[in-house]
Amino acid sequence: MAPRQSKTAKRNKTQNKTRTVDSEVFSDSAAKNLLADQPKLTPKSKVKKISKLALKKQQAKIRLYGAKNGKEYREDQLNIPTLNKAIVPGVKAKRGKKGKKFVDDNDTLTMNRLVKSINDKYDQVNESKLEKSRRLEEIRDLKRQEIERKEQQKKDKLEGKKDELRSKASVARSTRRKNAKARRADEESQEQEEESPKKKKKVSFV
């Protein structure tokens, strides 16, 4: 007769058979908490997987009626990168930075205004309210002078155009008058020629 096994021996025998290696994440509570804080790196697919029955039905419909055309997308939905466009002859594309304004070398007014407005953020670190108000007043005054100068330039341009048109009109008027005088003189000379009697030829016999 075989010797009887004790309960502890039996337990050890069964435990050895079913022993598994568990990760520290599940056994250690601190590691478990760290894992809980990690974000889900791979998002779940939103498209549901269709069942086998639905797939069979879909395939049968395709066999009977043919496959449907897929969804049509517009160009702006496809995120296609813009390619180099063809150059249109005669059209000159603008080059350079957008909104870039060049200042003339002799334009002291604009230069002063720009310098004062650029240094604005550096000057306001340690300045009194009186100094700040004085500086802002200077900037406003320079801007006002710039606006007045622009308006004056517009007026001068308009006046120049008007003078040009007036001179053109006066030249055209004088040429018209000259042509009219010449025409009148020609008509008068023709009338005189018609009125003067034609000389008769005289024949003398000896």
Curated annotation (Swiss-Prot):
Residues 118-196 form a coiled coil. Its main location: nucleus. Keywords: Coiled coil, mRNA transport, Nucleus, Ribosome biogenesis, Transport. Residues 1-25, 144-206 are annotated as: Disordered. One of its GO terms (molecular function) is mRNA binding. GO terms for cellular component: nucleolus; preribosome, large subunit precursor. It comes from the Eukaryota. GO terms for biological process: intracellular mRNA localization; mRNA transport; ribosomal large subunit biogenesis. It is found in: Nucleus, Nucleolus. Residues 7-16 have a biased composition (Basic residues). InterPro entries: Loc1 (IPR037650). Residues 144-167 have a biased composition (Basic and acidic residues). Required for efficient assembly and nuclear export of the 60S ribosomal subunit. Component of the 66S pre-ribosomal particle. Belongs to the LOC1 family. This is 60S ribosomal subunit assembly/export protein LOC1. The gene is LOC1.
